[in-house]
């Protein structure tokens, strides 16, 4: 028998907690035998004294096991259970293409996603723009769609990782969100509860990233790779660029449109293509569906070009209650804003730098993101045709199109866009879309 206050004292003094102590404390978080004050105190102790890798693995697995852990064995699936997770960005619509692409190559992707908060968009919010799509189906429907379509993208259900829900809300209110140990456990407990064989982790770097510096992003990527592999799930982390909007747009309905255009081949943003292919190729290799990076890319390009990935996206949408002809007729179903108008820079030159976070916040002010959890969204608003770094900007080339519901909302967003995109005399040096891969062998 352990005492919560003794566990807190031990960590406060910088000692290492045993797996049993961590399991006891997490059990207390779940069944309310540990108080809010005690949870806050342990969070602060970990924030200052940190945890070693064994402690992080113990915390992650205890939180994973605090609720239902999905088991796919009895479905008789003929491929690996694979997924990806992103730390969040602006115009990060990767999941919508990656899930169907991986499924088209023989994987099964039970993707449990989140809603947007702050400047980052949420995958579920994008699907809420599709009429009829159920982001919170019962587990039978979720399993059915995963088996039949190969992919289902839904929200976190109440019986998955209850310990994280309680712990996270307390961390949020007590300034301990930024601990790498606690971020690692929070992200991975939710992902690993989906019963994954392999995971590709997308850790963003730059002005629109969750972590403030490249070094902090790399530290998080290393922690996630070590802990996930330690918990028995093959995992690689990719450090990817978020110094500019990833897709050509940011919002909800506008990003769904870009995803469909990507899958059908109507338009593929080159940056979005590179990061999507990098993550998806890693998933295929980790899941044993491809022998090499080149083999994986060949398979992925094939399912894009022959329409199989687009077909699977359509089947997933129909399976979860959306329109059966969504791929063919998405324009009929997606909401459109009252005003769609260009924004021009005050001078000519080159797009030299971008405050991606501010562009994400411009979408929030339009009504396309949340200021606080529970806010209702306008799925039609956002930005499209956002320029890329290095683009030549002239008086007749817009830096973005703003989709707004009123004149005042348009003016406010247009001013924010002009402020966020800096025009210089010279094009900046090109940065890679993927900075590096962190595999288990690199640790």
Swiss-Prot record:
Homodimer. GO terms for biological process: pyrimidine nucleobase metabolic process; thymidine metabolic process. NCBIfam families: PRK05820.1 (NF004490), T_phosphoryl (TIGR02643), Y_phosphoryl (TIGR02644). This is Thymidine phosphorylase. GO terms for cellular component: cytosol. It comes from Shewanella loihica (strain ATCC BAA-1088 / PV-4). SMART domains: PYNP_C (SM00941). The enzymes which catalyze the reversible phosphorolysis of pyrimidine nucleosides are involved in the degradation of these compounds and in their utilization as carbon and energy sources, or in the rescue of pyrimidine bases for nucleotide synthesis. Keywords: Glycosyltransferase, Transferase. The keyword Acetylation does not apply. It is an enzyme of class 2 (transferase). Pathway: Pyrimidine metabolism; dTMP biosynthesis via salvage pathway; dTMP from thymine: step 1/2.
